[in-house]
Amino acid sequence: MANKKHKASSQRWLDEHFDDEYVKKAQRLGLRSRAVFKLEEINIKDRLIKPGMKVVDLGAAPGGWSEYAVKVVGDKGQVVACDILPMDAIVGVDFLEGDFREEEVLDALLTRINGKNIDVVMSDMAANMTGNESADSARSMYLVELALDMCSQVLKPNGAFVVKVFQGAGFEDYMKATRAVFKAVKTRKPESSRARSREVYLVATGYKG
């Protein structure tokens, strides 16, 4: 029964995806994914990413957020991206393919970052959904906890963090953990985020270091 529900949900997602105005807009503009519009909207509102900044993009593939960030930071900035999945090269983006939960990959990523000098950590990571709500929620929370932990390793004082989080079990605890290390934390639901989706974005600023 659960498998049938999962298949029905997957088909509904596909139907919505191909009829989505932001998917069509991304295709028309030659962009890698509709996710770029979410980051663009957040950045216009919160001004997280600015010219000359250094940015880390976790779960970067297919590259929509990196594509946007590198245009904003320009030649004097830096974008370091990482994903377990492959990603086509983007000029100006230093991409590392691998799972940063593995020590060797994490060491390689931290070497490229070279100290706590990052202005913005951003994460659009999401776990593969199985249809089991409790298991999916736990997997999703694990990923956002990893992203928050990365902030402690690479963010400079007063740096910023933007992360996709799914509302549900563990959400309030995660908000508290984020507020403990940032001066301000806001919740954003971009217009390009599907209304039915439980996803929101936390925008955290003023990293306490």
Curated annotation (Swiss-Prot):
Might you give the EC number(s) for this enzyme?
A: 2.1.1.166
Where primarily located? cytoplasm
GO MF, one annotated term: rRNA (uridine-2'-O-)-methyltransferase activity
| Pfam entry (one) | FtsJ
Task: State the InterPro entries in the record.
Answer: RNA_methyltr_RlmE (IPR050082), RNA_MeTrfase_FtsJ_dom (IPR002877), rRNA-MeTfrase_E (IPR015507), SAM-dependent_MTases_sf (IPR029063)
Alphabetical keyword list: Cytoplasm, Methyltransferase, rRNA processing, S-adenosyl-L-methionine, Transferase
Active site (catalytic residues): 164 (proton acceptor)
Recorded catalytic activity of this chain's protein: uridine(2552) in 23S rRNA + S-adenosyl-L-methionine = 2'-O-methyluridine(2552) in 23S rRNA + S-adenosyl-L-homocysteine + H(+)
GO cellular component: a single term: cytoplasm
Q: Where does S-adenosyl-L-methionine bind?
A: 63, 65, 83, 99, 124
Question: Coiled coil located at which positions?
Answer: none
- Subcellular localization(s) per the UniProt record: Cytoplasm
The record's annotation in NCBIfam families points to: PRK11188.1 (NF008390)
The family note in this entry says: Belongs to the class I-like SAM-binding methyltransferase superfamily. RNA methyltransferase RlmE family.
Instruction: Report the function annotation for this chain.
Output: Specifically methylates the uridine in position 2552 of 23S rRNA at the 2'-O position of the ribose in the fully assembled 50S ribosomal subunit.
Q: What is this protein called?
A: Ribosomal RNA large subunit methyltransferase E
Q: Which organism is it from?
A: Colwellia psychrerythraea (strain 34H / ATCC BAA-681)
Q: Which gene encodes it?
A: rlmE
